[in-house]
């Protein structure tokens, strides 16, 4: 495999060529009485003459191009083009003559392809991230750029500005860019928190609305109760029959109606002194069968 590391004098060698050659020797075999160098040359010749050698060489070049500097990547691309134009070796042998060598070439090509994919993945992710950052910075800079001067006076002022003013302007633009970047980060944080806790917020809002609905009667029902209240203001104590009629009219249950009148009396009603005296007489004379009549209701024994 040393040919792979010697395809051009401008590409540095990578260690391990001898170990790869020995691995190939295990697969190819033969030449027990030959010297080590002769065996290596024989293996090189067998690999270079195999029909799969151009594919193997191309896969190797693609691996070396990953993460290489632009000049090295261009050089590797040119080498691959020259190899393809010149036949790139191979073709002399035939597949099936040496099944073990065929299997080795196929396996090694697959290994190089997978290796190239694994090498490319972090570089692709880094390139995508850098592209995204560049786009964001470009948007920030374009948004922070002030409009050009439109009058001759502005143009004269710009021509007469000093280097100190230019530095100050650049600093201001940098501050604006940093502020917008901070706002963008805050917005992203808010979006993340909203996505994470939106369910809890919705449940809390629903519970809060339920509590508010429980404590506030519908407008039509409240109007009907106020109408009864104003009509019977001197004695705002509805009887059970009154509560049933109000319940049918408002759609509320008697308990809600009773609670509303209790609260309404506590806040907005106070019996007169004469009514208090009448109530006391009514209570005292209840045993004698006396009944006190008021505007809309009665208090009896």
Swiss-Prot record:
Family: Belongs to the TALE/KNOX homeobox family.
Biased composition (Low complexity): 144-153
UniProt-recorded Gene Ontology molecular function terms: DNA binding; DNA-binding transcription factor activity, RNA polymerase II-specific
Function: Probable transcription factor that may be involved in shoot formation during early embryogenesis.
DNA-binding region: 209-272
InterPro entries, per database record: ELK_dom, HD, Homeobox_CS, Homeodomain-like_sf, KN_HD, KNOX1, KNOX2, TALE_homeobox
Keyword DNA-binding tagged: yes
The protein, known as: Homeobox protein knotted-1-like 1
This protein's record includes keyword Glycoprotein: no
Chain intervals for the UniProt region annotation (Disordered): 141-170
Location in the cell: Nucleus
SMART domains attached to this UniProt entry: ELK, HOX, KNOX1, KNOX2
Protein keywords: DNA-binding, Homeobox, Nucleus
Main location (coarse class): nucleus
Residue intervals of the ELK domain: 188-208
Segments crossing the lipid bilayer: none
Classification of source organism: Eukaryota, Viridiplantae, Streptophyta, Embryophyta, Tracheophyta
One GO cellular component term: nucleus
